[in-house]
Design a protein with these regions (language model features):
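Short, P/G- and charge-enriched loop/turn segments at secondary-structure junctions
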Residues: 10-12, 54, 287, 314-319, ...
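Hydrophobic (often cysteine-bearing) scaffold residues that line and stabilize catalytic clefts
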Residues: 5, 57, 61, 66, ...
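Short loop/turn microsegments at loop-to-beta-strand junctions
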Residues: 19-21, 32, 180, 325-328
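Short, surface-exposed loop or secondary-structure junction motifs
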Residues: 96-316
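Short, conserved catalytic-motif segment at the N-terminal edge
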Residues: 2-57, 78-80, 144, 234, ...
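Short, well-ordered beta-strand elements
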Residues: 329, 336-345
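Short active-site loop at a secondary-structure junction
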Residues: 11-24, 44-104, 153-164, 244-247
Length: 373
């Protein structure tokens, strides 16, 4: 495949956009490009990136695990998009909060803040009570803080991307399925579809089989006192024990592709997810209860032209998502094009946003080389 695409990735490494990455491109159901570039880590030792490197997917957890789990529970008649959050949590039975539904959470229109540093309270408690960090009590404390959080907009009034909403969705999955989120996803998604290298890592419980595997390094974290590798980068997810609805999933580029293909095939009616629901989740939502200008589907984003990270050419029939660690998915259903970009752009520091310019340029180049625009 195009040497121009390889050159672009090599330029990204050389320019310091990211230490390394893995790019996978599929067109018309065929993987056309799958290549590793640069380094999986720079410190304490430089280690080359490989195609089977395991990445912290960050917010790709939202569509690939949490939204998929919600969809499965809906198609099994255990949930409905119109279910109010008050059905599961008494904290949402008062005021404007009683208007929040699962639909609002999936669509990032519930009116919840984007992020709060709950982990700081957990870290302080850890100093007094060693072992508290990552415990079930720590997770419960963070979830309670989320439930008590004041709304910053009326449900349905504004589009506000929110980790907090997906923390709550993870809790809904666990309440309805009566099992932890990681176990539900393993049983109903990952193991069923031969994704043996897609998993959450619970603090102190990394599976023996993965202890010798290559993980892409993320940040040199000041409060953890080390370079993070093989443990979740997201501070709140880490404080919650490594498993949360907004972050915590690890995988390879190949298995991310398999999970994305599962959505693609389901939309076409040939996959395991309900076709109508899969189409709904991956389509930009419109209507009276949807904020004007929102690009969100349900758990998935769609191109927000003219400044989408997908670039200039992905059609309105596209869906995708970004992850803070430097990961992204973009899928064009119209052209049967899938682009998986996994990088470690936060290594060794998150103070690097060059990928914001790099992503759309890369996607435009891929379109030129693969689709021929």
């Amino acid at each position: 495949m195009s040497s121009r695409i390889s050159q672009k990735m090599q330029e990204g490494v050389a320019a310091g956009v990211f230490p390394g990455g893995v790019l996978l491109v599929s067109s018309q159901g065929e993987v056309r490009f799958h290549q590793a570039f640069g380094s999986a880590s720079l410190i304490p030792n430089q280690v080359p990136m490989t195609c089977d490197t395991l990445f912290d997917l960050a917010s790709l957890t939202k569509p690939l695990a949490t939204a998929a789990a919600i969809l499965i529970l809906i198609q099994n008649d255990l949930l409905a998009l119109t279910d109010p959050l008050s059905k599961f949590f008494p904290e949402f039975t008062f005021g404007a909060k009683r208007e929040i539904t699962l639909y609002h959470l999936l669509n990032h229109s519930a009116g919840l803040p984007d992020w709060k540093p709950y982990y700081q309270e957990i870290a302080e408690q850890e100093e007094k009570d060693p072992g508290f960090l990552g415990s079930s009590a720590a997770k419960q404390k963070i979830c309670q803080r989320v439930k008590e959080e004041p709304l910053i907009a009326y449900p349905g009034a504004k589009s506000l991307y929110s980790d907090l909403g997906f923390i709550l969705l993870g809790e809904v999955v666990e309440a309805v399925a009566t099992e932890p989120l990681h176990r539900f996803c393993y049983r109903n998604l990952f193991s069923k579809h031969d994704c043996k290298e897609t998993f959450f890592i619970r603090l102190g419980r990394r599976p023996q089989a993965y202890r010798g595997r290559l993980f892409a390094a993320t940040e040199e974290c000041p409060w953890r006192g080390k370079v993070i590798r093989g443990w979740v980068h997201d501070d709140n997810a880490y404080a919650m024990g490594g498993v949360a609805g907004h972050a915590g999933l690890f995988s390879t580029a190949w298995e991310v592709y398999r999970l994305v293909r599962l959505w693609f095939d389901s939309i076409a009616g040939t996959g395991p997810l309900n076709s109508t629901l899969a189409t709904l989740f991956t389509t930009c939502q419109k209507g009276n209860d949807i904020p004007v200008g929102s690009s969100w589907g349900l758990g998935w984003d769609t191109p927000s032209h003219p400044h989408s990270s997908s670039g200039r050419f992905f059609s309105p029939m596209s869906f995708g998502h970004l992850g803070f660690t430097g990961t992204s998915i973009w899928v064009d259903r119209k052209r049967d094009l899938i682009v998986i970009l996994l990088t470690n752009r936060v290594h060794p520091s998150r103070d690097n946003s060059e990928i914001r310019l790099f992503r759309p340029e890369l996607h435009d180049l891929i379109f030129e080389e693969v689709v021929g625009v």
